[in-house]
């Protein structure tokens, strides 16, 4: 996945469905990235604390967050990841207990969803077919294709998965002292299930295309070959 100093949206889009929550209990969705050599930055869903009935009735989206090479991002929606860094998005579901003032007192993690893939940040795609394929599947990056259509032609329409529509949740931000919660990590209830709606790519077709491209450059520059291997992660 490409990363710049100005920030790139995380792709594939982070859309989730949650099942098995208790309808009248409060929950919060917390997202972070597990990355090499980096302490995770935890980001609460902007909808804040909601009842289980609401979370299970809507699509949960974390698509409005960005990764950046800037080590000191000023925007809370930015997550710093250096180039050539392996990472995996993770969504945790916390049950929230409110005090007598209806303020959060404790948070207890009840479920977690880790994508079954490891990604790697790169500053560019050197292989033409891989570049057009990846950009063609990312709606946030398709404007790059307009300047490269003639010299980087590749039909990717059949490989682009449908992007589900998302019904936004009403905003209810967490209080400023939300980071003072007490977190616990006991065994998850077996009835709660979190799953991504859209898997990253139709991987068999994509990997087959990338493997063919890699075979053509095996005798090329070693650094370029390394870069192409990064794309597959």
From Swiss-Prot:
Location, primary (coarse class): nucleus
Segments forming a coiled coil: none
GO CC terms: chromatin; nucleus
Subcellular localization, as worded in the UniProt entry: Nucleus
Keywords noted in UniProt: DNA-binding, Nucleus, Transcription, Transcription regulation
DNA-binding region extent: 1-146
Record's protein name: Putative T-box protein 41
Protein species of origin: Caenorhabditis elegans
């Amino acid at each position: 996945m490409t990363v710049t100093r100005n920030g790139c949206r995380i792709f594939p889009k982070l859309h989730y469905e949650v099942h098995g929550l208790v309808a009248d209990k409060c929950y919060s969705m917390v997202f972070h990235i597990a990355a090499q050599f980096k302490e995770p930055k935890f980001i609460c869903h902007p909808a804040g604390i909601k009842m289980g009935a609401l979370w299970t009735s809507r699509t949960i989206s974390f698509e409005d967050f960005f990764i950046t090479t800037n080590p000191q991002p000023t925007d809370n929606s930015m997550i710093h990841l250096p180039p050539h860094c392996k990472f995996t998005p993770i969504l945790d579901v916390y049950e929230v207990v409110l005090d007598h003032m209806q303020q959060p007192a404790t948070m207890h993690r009840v479920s977690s969803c880790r994508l079954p893939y490891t990604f790697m940040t790169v500053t560019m795609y050197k292989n033409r077919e891989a570049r057009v394929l990846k950009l063609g599947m990312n709606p946030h990056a398709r404007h790059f294709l307009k300047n490269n259509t003639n010299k980087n032609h590749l039909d990717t329409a059949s490989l682009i998965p449908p992007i589900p529509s998302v019904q936004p949740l009403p905003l209810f931000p967490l209080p400023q002292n939300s980071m003072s919660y007490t977190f616990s990590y006991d065994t998850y209830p077996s009835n709660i299930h979190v799953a991504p709606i859209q898997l990253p790519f139709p991987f068999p077709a994509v990997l087959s295309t990338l493997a063919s491209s890699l075979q053509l450059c095996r005798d090329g520059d070693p650094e370029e070959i390394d870069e192409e291997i990064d794309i597959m992660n």
